[in-house]
Regions:
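Interfacial helix-loop-helix junctions of multi-pass membrane proteins
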Residues: 39-45, 102-116
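Interfacial aromatic-anchored transmembrane helix boundaries in multi-pass membrane proteins
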Residues: 1-4, 32-66
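Alpha-helical transmembrane segments and their helix-entry boundary regions
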Residues: 24-28, 51, 84, 114
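Short helix-perturbing small/polar motifs within transmembrane alpha-helices
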Residues: 49-97
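Alpha-helical transmembrane segments and their cytosolic interface
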Residues: 116-153
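Hydrophobic transmembrane alpha-helices
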Residues: 1-25
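Generic alpha-helical transmembrane segments of integral inner-membrane proteins
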Residues: 14, 29, 33, 64-69, ...
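Structural signal for the C-terminal ends of transmembrane alpha-helices
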Residues: 18-19, 69-77, 140-144
C-alpha cells in the first residue's frame, strides 16, 4: 500500500497519555525534528525531509495536532480508560484527516480516493491502537504518579 500501517500512532497516543499535554507534545515535536534531520526514526527506519514531504508526511505532521488534542482532552477530564480511549480515538481521527488531505494533494487524488487510500484502511487498526494506548497509558501514568516519578498532570 501507498501508506504503511506502523506503530507510530500507537507510540504518539502512549506518549501523550502518559506524559500529558505539554511534555507529550514536546516529545512528539522532538521525534519529528529527529526524523527531519535524518535520524531513522520513521517507518522502516527512515528519516529526512524527503519523508516529511512524501506521501506519509501529512500523517507525521498531523502527530503535532494529534498530541495537542489528546493532551488537551485528558487535561480537561479525569484520567480513566474511557476518557483516554475517547482522547486517543479523536487523536487518530486528527492524524487521519491530516494524512488524507496531504495525500489528496500530493498524489492528486479525489476526496473519495484520499478517503479510501488514506483513512478507511486504517480505522479498525487505529481503534485497536487507541484501545492499547488508553489501556497501557492509563496504567503506566497512574503507576508513575503513585511512585512520585511523574507529577499528577
Amino acid at each position: 500500500p501507498l501508506i504503511p500501517i506502523t506503530g507510530q500512532t500507537l507510540a504518539i497516543g502512549l506518549v501523550v497519555t502518559i506524559l500529558g499535554l505539554k511534555h507529550g507534545t514536546y516529545a512528539v515535536l522532538l521525534y519529528i525534528l529527529l526524523g527531519a534531520i535524518g535520524l531513522p526514526v520513521f517507518q522502516s527506519f527512515t528519516g529526512g525531509l524527503g519523508i516529511l514531504f512524501g506521501p506519509t508526511g501529512g500523517y507525521i505532521i498531523g502527530f503535532i495536532p494529534t498530541a495537542i488534542v489528546i493532551g488537551f482532552y485528558l487535561k480537561k477530564t479525569r484520567l480513566t480508560f474511557t476518557h483516554a480511549l475517547v482522547a486517543n480515538i479523536l487523536g487518530m481521527l486528527v492524524t487521519l484527516a491530516f494524512g488524507a488531505v496531504w495525500l489528496k494533494y500530493l498524489a492528486e487524488l479525489s476526496w473519495t480516493g484520499a478517503l479510501f487510500s488514506g483513512v478507511i484502511p486504517f480505522l479498525i487498526v487505529g481503534v485497536i491502537k487507541a484501545i492499547l494506548a488508553a489501556w497501557v497509558g492509563v496504567i503506566v501514568r497512574q503507576r508513575l504518579e503513585q511512585a512520585n516519578i511523574l507529577r499528577t498532570i
